[in-house]
Swiss-Prot record:
Family affiliation: Belongs to the QueA family.
Protein known as: S-adenosylmethionine:tRNA ribosyltransferase-isomerase
One matching Pfam family: Queuosine_synth
Pathway named in the protein's UniProt entry: tRNA modification; tRNA-queuosine biosynthesis
Length: 357
């Protein structure tokens, strides 16, 4: 399959640069995978699509204030974007204006440049930085000097709404540099209404890295190598999934990150033994992949030629997905992180679809 197969023309006017003030009032497209039928609703109507006995699984990662600035020993300014917290005092990060930064280089951060960091390793395009601080940990330092990084296509200044609305209401475990955006549409009243309906709700953790915004640079998508991200799926979640399916309930994943975490766990030895799955994953899901767990997926409208739209195609079917996206454009849905949402059910025939463009 070629990268261009997943291209489409998106008017810039449909890119959302600001969040919905009331989370659950965004628009919702519903598409049933087995029929391709489409319905237009609001996100709070999603309660009508989910049944008592179903299990919703959300990604409880929390976005860290991963973007901050520092000075090189020469006085030159650098911008740091944390990719991963490696330990108590160590981070993995990309550095803008990284010319002449090598192993052993010193970078100074914070008020009056009192926080010193040393580059102790270089890994591909990332640098490992060690903070020389006997009091604060790396996460404490980041919380003190950093700011929440909005997606790179949003060029405006951040505001107080972003601090709140670019996090989910159920955030718990710090580590992402980008929000699990499908979850942004849930507010506490909606979660309570789902619970009162008899819907079970549980959580996994996948810390989203900068690779989620990186373009595919291969003509043939099968040659693409995914970035690696940290994932945790607890033994209790695995047991709940097995029990739910045994009773005839459905598994509903909120976000592509949740689906990828579950599929990664499924292919591990921990799944059959119902043990905690804690690992890194670089699973790449594209058309032809056979899904094993999720019956319905809640997701946003994604970038052309992205790994995310490829995952949606694998779940919903290529023709269904392209029809849904064309319908979204005609009906002026909002796209990307702050945009509108889809609720899609699994098309079991998708892996066998005749992929002819």
């Amino acid at each position: 399959m070629q990268l261009s197969d997943f291209s489409f023309d998106l008017p810039k006017s449909l890119i959302s640069f600001h969040p919905y003030f009331i989370r659950s009032t965004c628009r919702l497209m519903v598409m049933y995978g087995h029929t391709g039928m489409i319905f237009h609703k609001r996100f709070f109507n999603i309660i009508d699509e989910i049944n008592s006995g179903d299990l919703i699984i959300l990604n409880n990662t929390q976005v860290i204030p991963a973007r901050f600035f520092g000075k090189k020993e020469s006085g030159g300014k650098v911008e740091v974007l944390v990719e991963k917290i490696l330990g108590i005092n160590n981070i993995l990060a990309s550095i803008k204006n990284s010319k002449n930064i090598n192993i052993g280089s010193k970078i100074f951060f914070g008020y009056k440049d009192k926080i010193k960091g040393s580059v102790v390793d270089c890994k591909n395009s990332f640098f490992e930085i060690f903070f020389h601080d006997n009091i604060d940990s790396a996460i404490d330092i980041i919380n003190n000097i950093g700011e929440i990084p909005l997606p790179p296509y949003i060029k405006r200044f951040r505001n107080k709404l972003d601090v709140d609305l670019y996090q989910t209401v159920y955030k718990k475990k710090t580590g992402s540099i980008a929000a699990p955006t499908a979850g942004l549409h849930f507010d506490l009243p909606l979660l309570e209404a789902l619970h009162n309906k008899g819907v079970d709700i549980d959580y996994i953790t996948l810390h989203i890295g900068s690779g989620t915004f990186q373009p595919i640079r291969r003509v043939q998508i099968e040659e693409h190598i995914m970035h690696s991200e940290s994932v945790e799926v607890s033994s209790s979640v695995i047991q709940k999934i097995k029990s739910c399916k045994k009773k005839g309930g459905r598994i509903i994943a909120v976000g592509t990150s949740t689906l990828r975490a579950l599929e990664s766990a499924y292919h591990s030895s921990e799944w059959s033994d119902s043990k905690d799955f804690i690992s890194d994953t670089n699973i790449f899901i594209y058309p032809g992949y056979k899904h094993n767990i999720v019956d319905a997926l809640i997701t946003n409208f994604h970038f052309p030629e992205s790994t995310l739209i490829m995952l949606v195609c694998s779940f919903l079917g290529y023709k269904n997905t392209m029809n849904a996206y064309n319908t979204a454009i005609v009906n002026k849905y909002s796209f990307f992180s702050y945009g509108d949402a889809m609720y899609i059910t699994h098309n079991k025939l998708a892996p066998y679809e005749n992929f002819i463009i």
